[in-house]
């Protein structure tokens, strides 16, 4: 079966690199499924799970936003943060998830947005960690 090369990169360095059969991500415009030979594309990503299918198995990577660049033979995900399901510290993610209090008080709009994004990232990480 044909494959496409995938690189997931963060400011801290590469997180994942391999040849896969299909890449699925959630872009700001909606879900995208990328197969080998896909047309060129650049899209902003949501905080979500990237799904990488290879050999009948699916690997999950928690992606905290960023951008997707697609070429016919390569997909690059440039993310602010990304973690493979097996690398996620579930206790740390649960601690972040329990930080819902700033969302309830809404004292400062900037703090609210930061807390909201931190909560989304934590929930995404927990969701991906459960997919191991």
From Swiss-Prot:
Keywords: ATP synthesis, Cell membrane, CF(1), Hydrogen ion transport, Ion transport, Membrane, Transport
One Gene Ontology cellular component: plasma membrane
Annotated source species: Bacillus caldotenax
Family: Belongs to the ATPase epsilon chain family.
Its membrane topology: Peripheral membrane protein
Gene responsible for this protein: atpC
Location of the protein in the cell: Cell membrane
Main location as per UniProt: membrane
Subunit structure: F-type ATPases have 2 components, CF(1) - the catalytic core - and CF(0) - the membrane proton channel. CF(1) has five subunits: alpha(3), beta(3), gamma(1), delta(1), epsilon(1). CF(0) has three main subunits: a, b and c.
4Fe-4S listed as a keyword: no
Function (record text): Produces ATP from ADP in the presence of a proton gradient across the membrane.
NCBIfam families xref list: ATP_synt_epsi, PRK00571.1-3, PRK13446.1
Phylogenetic classification of the source organism: Bacteria, Bacillati, Bacillota, Bacilli, Bacillales
Protein's name in the database: ATP synthase epsilon chain
Domain of life: Bacteria
Single Gene Ontology MF annotation: ATP binding
